[in-house]
Regions:
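Nucleotide-activated chemistry modules centered on ATP-dependent adenylation/adenylyltransferase
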Residues: 1-406
């Protein structure tokens, strides 16, 4: 798989010279309904398929049923009409790693689930979960930025249309997209909004067309179902895939081990939403327990909550260091024993095994520092923000880690 986007080098010899339309396809009901309807009569919708590319960005954590529906109903449709289908992903954690073209074909046979690097890889390696507050940075990072990095060199500044699958209830996203657009020559097109099609109309169209209920497309660990009022449906999806639920529970549990505030749904955790007395919920919890049967690590975590020169809150700085590797129970007993001997506050989760010792708790007001030792599944890497140590020394006068664990 090529790791960078194809860029035309000889005008007149490239398949992209006449490209004038890009269709963003997120696999969900909205953009799929547009694509399926448009293909019934491309000319009537102002689309020249010879000059069009459908763009899909693989995040790596799409629900299995979405992938199956795409391969059963939509890929045959793309092949029938000879639609150019470009599948992309990030190549690595850093922007400098570039993007990977997973496939670029007018006869696509497979929907690629992931590329060399995924959002899950990123979240798991740093021990965090998506944040509910603010912009959907994870989507921009794994989708928007990836697509833009293919489009910009491919189009080379030529005028083109980019079709976005926002439904009629998402008028605000149209204005946000127009404002955020930075690619030279780009003009956003929003057909579902123009048609007045809301999400239900899109789902109804796909039901009539294919005889299936087309689910919403999003990552299995997405934090937004609760804010969209779709949490019950999301939990049902989890119950249908207990192994996936177990993995997401481990992701959240690890993140909360390093930061108790890292709950998947703001003030609520995924774990608390499962009732062990219910058989289908219990299956998810049992899958979670199996996920925890792996090497664990003892981590030293420090955070800085600093203010700028103008008094505004700066992004939180963090240092995460793996101190030891072993079994959950062994590491937990060690941390509890040492903490109690030194009079340090310690917490223990007897059900799933985490132990956490607070050397320094955060205060209520900024600036402040936080320091703790915790046990967690050994998936988190050593990572420290730039200039962390001098900033830590400046705020704390160098005091750190009074537990003899390192």
């Amino acid at each position: 798989m090529p790791r960078t986007a194809y860029t035309p080098s000889l005008p007149g010899l490239s398949t992209t010279d006449d490209l004038d339309t890009i269709i963003n396809w997120g696999l969900g009901a909205d953009s799929t309904a547009y694509l399926a309807r448009m293909l019934t009569d491309p000319d009537a919708h102002g689309i020249d398929l010879k000059r069009t590319a459908v763009l899909y960005m693989a995040t790596g954590s799409e629900w299995p049923e979405t992938r199956l529906l795409v391969e059963e109903f939509m890929l045959p449709l793309l092949r029938e009409h000879g639609v150019r289908f470009v599948q992309l992903s990030r190549s690595g954690h850093l922007k400098a790693d570039g993007i990977t073209v997973l496939d670029d074909s007018r006869h696509p046979e497979t929907l690629f689930a992931r590329g060399p690097w995924t959002l899950w890889d990123e979240l798991e390696s740093v021990g965090t979960v998506p944040q509910q507050a603010g912009a959907r940075k994870c989507s921009l990072r794994a989708k928007g930025d990836v697509g833009d990095r293919w489009i910009a060199p491919t189009m080379g500044g030529r005028p083109f249309r980019q079709v976005m699958g926002f439904n009629a209830d998402e008028e605000g996203r149209r204005f946000t997209d127009i404002i955020a657009s930075k690619i030279p020559g780009r003009r956003g097109v929003y057909p579902l909004i123009d048609w007045g099609w809301d999400r239900q109309q899109c789902k109804d169209y796909l039901w009539k067309r294919f005889g299936v209920h087309w689910p919403k497309s999003y990552c299995v660990f997405c934090c937004f179902p609760v804010s969209m009022g779709a949490l019950p449906a999301h939990l049902e999806r989890m119950r249908s895939h207990p192994d996936i639920a177990g993995e997401v529970l481990r992701l959240e549990y690890t993140a909360m081990s390093l930061n108790p505030k890292a709950k998947l749904y703001g003030k609520r955790t995924l774990l608390e939403l499962f009732d062990p007395s219910q058989p289908r919920d219990r299956a998810c919890l049992e899958a979670f327990e199996r996920e925890l049967h792996m090497p664990w690590a003892l981590y030293h975590v420090r955070r800085l909550f600093l203010l700028s020169s103008s008094g505004e809150r700066r992004p939180v700085m963090r240092s995460t260091e793996r101190v030891d590797l072993g079994r959950a129970r062994q590491l937990g007993q060690r941390l509890i024993s040492v903490s109690e001997r030194h009079g340090i506050e310690v917490e223990h989760d007897p059900v799933y095994g985490r132990a956490r010792s607070w050397v320094r708790r955060r205060r209520e007001t900024w600036p402040m520092a936080e320091e703790l030792f915790t046990t967690a599944p050994a998936r988190v890497i050593n990572k420290q923000d730039k200039n962390f140590e001098p900033a830590w020394d400046a705020l704390t006068s160098g005091s750190t880690a009074q537990l003899p664990l390192t």
